[in-house]
Amino acid sequence: MSLLEVRDLSVSFGARQVVDKVSFSLDAGEKLALVGESASGKTVTALSTLRLIENARLTGEILFNGKQVLKMLPEELCELRGRDIAVIFQEPMTALNPIYAVGDQIVESIELHTKLRGAQAWAEAVGAMRRVGIDDTERRARSYPHQLSGGQRQRAMIAMALACNPKLLIADEPTTALDAAIRLQVLELLEDLRAQAGMALLLITHDLNLVRRFADRVAVMERGVMVEQGPTAQVIEHPRHPYTQKLVNSRPVRDVGPPGAGRVVEARDVRVEYPTRLPGIRGWFMSGRFTAVEGVDFDLAPGETLGIIGESGSGKTTLALAVLGLMEAQGEIRIGGSSWRVSAKEKRMLRREIQVVFQDPLSSLSPRLTVEAIIGEGLEIHAPELNAADRRKRIVQALYDVGLTEAGEAEPLLARYPHEFSGGQRQRIAIARALIVKPKVVVLDEPTSALDVTIQKQVLELLAGLQRKYGLSYILVTHDIDVVRAMAHRVMVMKDSRIVESGALEQILVNSRSDYTRKLVEAGVA
């Protein structure tokens, strides 16, 4: 008998059906990956096994250890959740309660599902955190979620999920919010803990590289329908369904032209420091200094892409903000030969030369502004001489350049708001906003990490085409080695605020001299 068996599961919200007659099974100790893009129904399917989907109508059968989950009473469901089946959510910062210490949140689960209380429950919680590799465990257990790094928060959530030794662990995109090296550590940790406890794992993901390495079987979902399932090697190496084939073939393809001569960005001995609060009574009277970037030098040529890689906290995003003139820095940074140490008026003119595309377009685009207002905002600042007709013409051309519309068909889009577009379309709007002022340099801060794999490929192809068309230079900040391979001419590796090594793409990714770089590359292809 299977540990979990789902038969003809359908889920609907009112008249809208989001999962349609899905069937699969999972044996004790087995690893099954549910794969699909956003809105494929994979998360709804997995969370339905615990009846965690509110205001939904569920039909079909869900059996756990032979018991009908859809017929369980509330007290039976309470025992099932956390004790027999546990969940790790995608973003630990939103899943953990910000007003309670991490250890207290783990204690709550232990006291709910076991007979341990007080000091015994606390000791068990600290032990669970120690087992998942959190160092300085007693202090971390008394810390609040915001005081931990992303990797530590995810480990704390894993500790909470595994504290009561569940038979099944549901991991919903458990590493999407983490950088490559931490992602590999967390996945290897999950695999070790799963093997030790003989636990089954239901992995929800859109990352086929992850599936290749960690799943025994894979089930592919598209628009609420399970289109294909089977052993991992069979499904990925010989996909039968067109949708599975599209997912497998969505890996970015390298398509870059040669860079030009000269320099559009020059950085010399760049140093960025933050004030930090000192511990104890000293913190009342003085502050310390934290160095986020130390002694960084680099150049960027016209039409060139420089990939900056490194773990969270390595200083790569801080360096990008300094280059953008958004953070005070020591040393020398020149954009097109001009320094940021100029008057406010000259600084405004310089900002036209360098623009940025952020990681998550939903949070970087104002929900109160229309597409026309979002894209045209830069023109109001940098080209105030344009009349309304000319400004709209430039906006329409920008939409056409990023592939959101055919010529002459932009009018219906201009009055719409960001929430009315898909994730990929929103990122195209963000790119159009950056390009509307005709910059020489664009900083790309994790430009595809919030997108599905097929949309990632489309956006990367768009960026490559725009680079060839306009001679753009890119500073690409990312932890995705596949994206670096597809876009970068040169790579710079950062660790603990410093450059570990830099050079041509092949030199760094294939013939690296640094153990740290090799670890990043290995994690990126995991």
Show the residue positions of the predicted features:
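Conserved ABC ATPase "signature" region
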Residues: 120-139, 390-412, 522
